[in-house]
């Protein structure tokens, strides 16, 4: 006979408790005990409860290997319960044979209906560390089960592959939004839709009467940053600053030679550059920068309210004056092929010509941001990381424990996006000039160009030559966060991988990397994505990239959407007239006629309001309430990571006090651990 204390912790979320009966059996090196019911007087397993149970085992099972948890309905059905599956969220189990000698079994899973969970003691183990056949068999069975539950599908040819579920109703509770998060998202969507519907804006297919009328819509859920955008959107300095610190801060690059198809001359830009210099001198000095939206050339366009929509493929040349002067646009060409019907617009042109040219650039920024930077890089690729993690890494694996907080809710939000945003006839088709067809074109085109280095911030900054451009807060804050993540990951890797050989010998890790390469990057070797990792250094870089992409990168390109776009002329989602082919034609009336119709603008506002802020149940970067790591060494690393993020946040907030428009999107407490909205 053997006696032990079993302590059980139930989650605090709404619906986490259960009326079902829970039993456990203990698996050890000498065998497995019979199922032992966990019950006492009163109700067990209420939400938020931690409960102790004294159990007696008929035999000694030897060294404990696993805990088998069994849940079944009560023998006597309770009123109103017989028609539903009673789910239970278990946080952890603890076994104590002697006082002070407890074994901890992390769980942090939902168990729906009648079923069974197998839990291992919390110490993380790489596959080559498991020598007992029972543990080896458990790892394999766990992965086989998850690979059946979470399978791949091709949603659109040429896109990264994704989860093979049609709707969020099909998802199991372990990858689904919490009840609170779901309710808040629904309330947000419903309130936004109702307000705009009552105002009649969703049914108006015509033009806005004036910018002043747009201003009245702008009163919808204002923010301080959005107010700043409204006040400064026409200014050249603000236009340029958005390439650095707006929602698409990843395109600008230093220009050392002008493209052949962008024939800017000294005469054109002399009024901006001033005396005593030239284009060639500024190119050699490194003070010119280029933003090229050429990927949009010839892209599919949409039809809205029965009218064809239009897109441009502009190139924008910007100049950084010496000293502390602002970055300014000095030339814009709206199409890729130069010619008499493709003028180069200049700041010295008529006010409305120049404003219209800048607005076409902003429309192109919107398309590339939403389709490529946001949807592809910050949603579809993180979904690949999430799905491969669930399919190839068992829960006891140190990299599963490290990554699971960073894939929370990603499969839910992406499944919801395929239902409500990118499906034919949904929000993207209702509000944007490219529609789902154009978005699909852009994603396919970028997938053919996408390189591993683009996903690694330090390499991307170097490749674009923007290491020293002043006022680039996305770079400054992002590099600090990248460094903090890399230091944290390096410590975790050093704990579990003593050598490069140990990385090479981890077959679960290698299967994970191969699956990301084959399913996410479609086996394209030119992407530079690894299909195997053979050193600790390569592993640290790869995991840092994954965590940064799922957290900071997503925050940088997602959190500011409402701020930047709610004043629609700053980032119009469509253009109703073609790009101008000559100068001197733009007027206030033609500017308004080019902008989106009222209903398209309004549907766009609904999408922005939904996608810009987390609807509750948030977990900021480095906040890990689910304690998957139980050993002292990784817990110390987590604490050090959290302290570093606090220091970074203090520095960002101190800097922001001196800025007219604070850059907050990479302040660590405002970064979500995962792609969850």
UniProtKB/Swiss-Prot annotation:
It comes from Mus musculus. This is Polyunsaturated fatty acid lipoxygenase ALOX8. Keywords: Calcium, Cytoplasm, Dioxygenase, Iron, Lipid metabolism, Lipid-binding, Membrane, Metal-binding, Oxidoreductase. Residues 2-125 form the PLAT domain. Belongs to the lipoxygenase family. The lineage of its organism: Eukaryota, Metazoa, Chordata, Craniata, Vertebrata. InterPro entries: LipOase, LipOase_C, LipOase_C_sf, LipOase_CS, LipOase_Fe_BS, LipOase_mml, PLAT/LH2_dom, PLAT/LH2_dom_sf. Non-heme iron-containing dioxygenase that catalyzes the stereo-specific peroxidation of free and esterified polyunsaturated fatty acids generating a spectrum of bioactive lipid mediators. Catalyzes the peroxidation of arachidonate and linoleate into (8S)-HPETE and (9S)-HPODE respectively. In addition to generate (8S)-HPETE from free arachidonic acid (AA), may produce other HETE isomers from phospholipid-esterified polyunsaturated fatty acids and minor products derived from (8S)-HPETE itself that may include leukotriene A4 and 8,15-diHPETE. The keyword Cytoplasm applies. It is a peripheral membrane protein. The PLAT domain can bind calcium ions; this promotes association with membranes. Expressed in epidermis and brain. No expression found in heart, spleen, liver, skeletal muscle, kidney or testis.
């Amino acid at each position: 006979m053997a006696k032990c204390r079993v302590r059980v912790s139930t989650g605090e979320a709404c619906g986490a408790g259960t009326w079902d009966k829970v039993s456990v059996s203990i698996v050890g090196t000498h065998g497995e005990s019979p199922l032992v019911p966990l019950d006492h007087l009163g109700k067990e397993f209420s939400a938020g409860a931690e409960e102790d149970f004294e159990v007696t085992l008929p035999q000694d099972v030897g060294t404990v290997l696993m805990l088998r948890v069994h849940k079944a309905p009560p023998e006597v059905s309770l009123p109103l319960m017989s028609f539903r599956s009673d789910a239970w969220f278990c946080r952890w189990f603890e076994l104590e044979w002697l006082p002070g000698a407890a074994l901890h079994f992390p769980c942090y899973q939902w168990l729906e209906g009648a079923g069974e969970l197998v839990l291992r003691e919390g110490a993380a183990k790489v596959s080559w560390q498991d020598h007992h056949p029972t543990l080896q068999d458990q790892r394999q069975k766990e992965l086989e089960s998850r690979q059946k539950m979470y399978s791949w599908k091709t949603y659109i040819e040429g896109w990264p592959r994704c989860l093979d579920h049609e709707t969020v109703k099909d998802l199991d509770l372990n990858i689904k939004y919490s009840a609170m998060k779901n309710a808040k998202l629904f309330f947000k969507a419903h309130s936004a839709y109702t307000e705009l519907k009552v105002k009649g804006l969703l049914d108006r297919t015509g033009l806005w009467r004036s910018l002043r009328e747009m201003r009245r819509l702008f009163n919808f859920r204002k923010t301080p940053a959005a107010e700043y955008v409204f006040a400064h959107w026409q200014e050249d300095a603000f236009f340029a600053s958005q390439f650095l610190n707006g929602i698409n801060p990843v395109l600008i690059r230093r220009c050392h030679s002008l493209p052949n198809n962008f024939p800017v001359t000294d005469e054109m830009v002399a009024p901006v550059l001033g005396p005593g210099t030239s284009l060639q001198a500024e190119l050699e000095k490194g003070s010119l920068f280029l933003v090229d939206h050429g990927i949009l050339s010839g892209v599919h366009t949409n039809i809205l309210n029965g009218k064809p929509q239009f897109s441009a493929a502009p190139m924008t040349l910007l100049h950084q004056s010496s000293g502390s002067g602002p970055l300014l646009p000095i030339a814009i060409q709206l199409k890729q092929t130069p010619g008499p019907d493709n003028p180069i617009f200049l700041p010295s042109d008529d006010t409305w010509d120049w404003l219209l040219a800048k607005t076409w650039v902003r429309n192109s920024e919107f398309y590339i941001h939403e389709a490529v930077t946001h949807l592809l890089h910050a949603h579809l690729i993180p979904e690949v990381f999430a799905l491969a993690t669930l399919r190839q890494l068992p829960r006891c694996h140190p990299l599963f424990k490290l990554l699971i907080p960073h894939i929370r809710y990603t499969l839910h939000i992406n499944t919801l996006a395929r239902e409500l945003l990118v499906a034919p006839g949904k929000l993207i088709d209702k509000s944007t000039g490219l529609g789902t067809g154009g978005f699909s074109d852009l994603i396919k085109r970028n997938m053919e160009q996408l390189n591993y280095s683009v996903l690694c911030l330090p390499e991307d900054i170097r490749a674009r030559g923007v290491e020293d451009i002043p006022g680039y807060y996305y770079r400054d804050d992002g590099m600090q966060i990248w460094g903090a993540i890399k230091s944290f990951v390096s410590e975790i890797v050093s704990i579990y991988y003593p050598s490069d050989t140990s990385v090479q010998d981890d077959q679960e890790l290698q299967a994970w990397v191969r699956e990301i390469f084959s399913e996410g990057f479609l086996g394209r070797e030119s992407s530079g994505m690894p299909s195997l990792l053979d050193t600790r250094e390569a592993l640290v870089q790869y995991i840092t990239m994954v965590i940064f992409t799922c957290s900071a990168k997503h925050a940088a390109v997602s959190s500011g959407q409402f701020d930047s776009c709610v004043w629609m002329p700053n980032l119009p989602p469509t253009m109703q007239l073609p790009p101008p082919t000559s100068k001197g034609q733009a007027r206030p009336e033609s500017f308004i006629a080019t902008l989106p119709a009222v209903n398209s603008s309004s549907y766009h506002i609904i999408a922005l309001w939904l996608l810009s802020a987390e609807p509750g149940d948030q977990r900021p970067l480095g906040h890990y309430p689910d304690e998957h790591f139980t050993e002292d060494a990784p817990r110390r690393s987590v604490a050090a990571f959290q302290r570093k993020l606090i220091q970074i946040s203090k520095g960002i907030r101190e800097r922001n006090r001196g800025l007219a428009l604070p850059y907050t999107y990479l302040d660590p407490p405002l970064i979500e651990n995962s792609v969850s909205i």
